[in-house]
Amino acid sequence: MARIRIALLLLGMLPVTAVTAAPQHAPWPGGIAVIDVGPAEAPRPFVEFDARRVLVTRNGDRWLAAVGIPLDAEPGERSIRVNTARDVAFEVREHAYSEQRLTVTNKKYVSPDEAELERIGRERRIIDAALGHWRDVDVDGLALAAPVDGLRSSSFGLRRFFNDQPRAPHKGMDIAAAEGTVIAAPGNGIVAATGDYFFNGKTVIVDHGQGFVTMYCHLSRIGVAEGQQLEAGEPIGAVGATGRVTGPHLHFGTYLNGTAVDPALLLQ
């Protein structure tokens, strides 16, 4: 099977008229590799990365794949499979994330008991299924509006310690805002799931198509229902302090091919 290396397209190299169709090329852990996969006069290609379907969007006269790179990916050469017939290589670069230490007063959110761990496991399966869902529709672009105005209080990828105990890296962007502040859908989509979860609190997950999914956590109230069609700007809930938090804020997560990626790369 032929192995073909195709040059990666940086946004700065794209025509001005097509800039909004593709995210920033950021080929590092937690980032997005933007890869040219062929001329747009051909049908939209079938692209996979690590056995997961990858979003492909039209950008001018080309098809571009937007590959979410896992936070734990090692630097080096990786590849995507295009139309099950050829491999396209790309390079994962090194990228350093800062450390964050937080104090949580409710100890159950640091050391859950057995019953709580069982609940966390059940909820994780529900959340993972929604975040990894594939809906085969055309996606015109990945640019998102900010879901709420506020201070970006914690960035993506932070290596986190709760009460000095190491925990998973931060897989979203925290936006500090007053409790009750309305959260707006940043783009068109369908509500994939809602729930009140142990760590995430009241949560909404929105499917924007082709594995492009956004998540909103710690809400004070949920204003949408599963399966509901959304247009950009529609309210989906309100900022709160439910779940594992140190104060009111929105945890905003963005996902491609089931992988958490930095929301800052997608915000307009």
What is each model feature region?
Residues 1-5:
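Positively charged n-region of N-terminal signal peptides that target proteins for export
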Residues 7-17:
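Bacterial N-terminal signal peptides
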Residues 11-13, 25-27, 37, 46, ...:
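Generic marker of residues within folded, mature protein domains
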Residues 17, 29-31, 149, 265:
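Intrinsically disordered, low-complexity segments enriched in proline/serine/threonine
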Residues 20-90, 94-96:
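Cationic-aromatic interfacial patches
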Residues 21, 89-200:
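Surface-exposed, glycine-biased beta-strand/turn segments
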Residues 55, 64, 74, 96-99, ...:
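A short local loop/turn or secondary-structure capping micro-motif enriched for an aromatic residue
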Residues 145-268:
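Catalytic cores of peptidoglycan-degrading enzymes
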